[in-house]
Amino acid sequence: MNEQIITILAEDGTKTSKIRKLLLLGLTHREIANLVTRGNRGFVWNVYKRMRDEGLIVSAGTPTATTTPELDYSFRRKFGVEIEAYNCTCQRLVRELTEAGIEVASERYNHDLRPHWKLVTDSSLNGNDTFELVSPILEGEDGLEKLERVCWVLDSCNVKINGSCGLHVHMNAEDFNITTWRNLLLSYKHAEAEIDKFMPASRRGGSNTYCGSLIQFPDERIRSARNIRELQGLFPSRYMKVNLQAYSRHRTVEFRQHSGTSVLQK
C-alpha cells in the first residue's frame, strides 16, 4: 500500500478528513470506502460532493451518451437512535457529552421527542448505572457525524453492554406507501434467519421479549394489508424486531433487533 495512504489512515483525524485527503490522492470511491468506512460508499460520496461544491475537486464533465452516469449514494434520510448501556452515571455522561458539544439532558422515562439528546432510565436493563441515550432527529451525513462524536464519548466513559442492552434505530417513514411497508416486512421476515446468525443468542429467534420474531406471521396476511393501520393490527406490539407502532407516534419505522453497542460502525 502507498506510504501516503498508510500515513493518512494512521492519523487521529475524523473519517471525513481522511476521505478528503484520499480523494485528493485520486483513489476511487470504492477503494476509499473499503479503507475507511467498511464499504459505505454513501459516506464517501457525500464528502466528494461537498468537496466538488467547494471547488476542491473538478468534476469529469457532463456525461456523454456512452458514459455511465454517476450514481448518487448520498444518505439524506432522517433517523434516530436509542442506545442502551450501563457502567456510567447519568451525571458523568451529561458532563462529558456537554463538554464534547452535544446538547443533552437527563430526564425521567418518556417517549417525547426532544430537540436534544436525552438520558433516561429503563427498568428492562441489568447492571450498575444503566441508562438509555435517545437522540433527537438526526439527518444524513451530518447526523452520522454527530452520532460518531457521541459514540466516542461513550467509549471514553467506558460504558459497557450486556445481553439486556439493545440498539434501536428509527428511520423516517413519512414517504412510505403500502407497497414499501409490505416489501420491508416480507424482506426482513425472509432474511430474519440469516440476520439472527450475526446477532448474539439473546436477540435471535423469538426468545427476546423486547424484539419479537416476524417469522410467525403469514406472507399472505402481510400482502393483503391495504394500509399501515391494517399492518399495525397484524403486528400489534411495539416489541417486535420491526416495530410498526412507532409510525403512529413518530412517523418512523423502528428496528429493534440489534444488540447494544457504542461502536459507530456496528
Q: How would you describe each model-predicted region?
A:
Residues D53-C157, L244:
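Terminal catalytic/cofactor-binding subdomain
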